[in-house]
């Protein structure tokens, strides 16, 4: 589904943000 693409991108962004705060 195309709707899963932006959802996945958002999840990746959130993960990166979490890693940045943890660093």
UniProtKB/Swiss-Prot annotation:
Residue ranges that the Swiss-Prot or TrEMBL entry lists as coiled coil: none
One GO cellular component term: extracellular region
Broad class of the protein's primary localization: secreted
Tissue specificity remark: Hemolymph.
Compartment(s) where it occurs, according to its Swiss-Prot or TrEMBL record: Secreted
UniProt keyword terms in alphabetical order: Lipid transport, Secreted, Transport
A single GO BP: lipid transport
Primary role: Assists in the loading of diacylglycerol, generated from triacylglycerol stores in the fat body through the action of adipokinetic hormone, into lipophorin, the hemolymph lipoprotein. It increases the lipid carrying capacity of lipophorin by covering the expanding hydrophobic surface resulting from diacylglycerol uptake. It thus plays a critical role in the transport of lipids during flight in several species of insects.
Subunit structure: Equilibrium between a soluble monomer and a bound lipoprotein form. Apolipophorin-3 associates with lipophorin during lipid loading until each particle contains 9 or 14 molecules of apolipophorin-3.
Family the UniProt entry places it in: Belongs to the insect apolipophorin-3 family.
Protein name: Apolipophorin-3
Organism: Melanoplus sanguinipes (Migratory grasshopper)
């Amino acid at each position: 589904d195309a709707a899963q693409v932006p959802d996945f991108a958002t999840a990746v962004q959130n993960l990166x943000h979490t890693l940045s705060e943890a660093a």
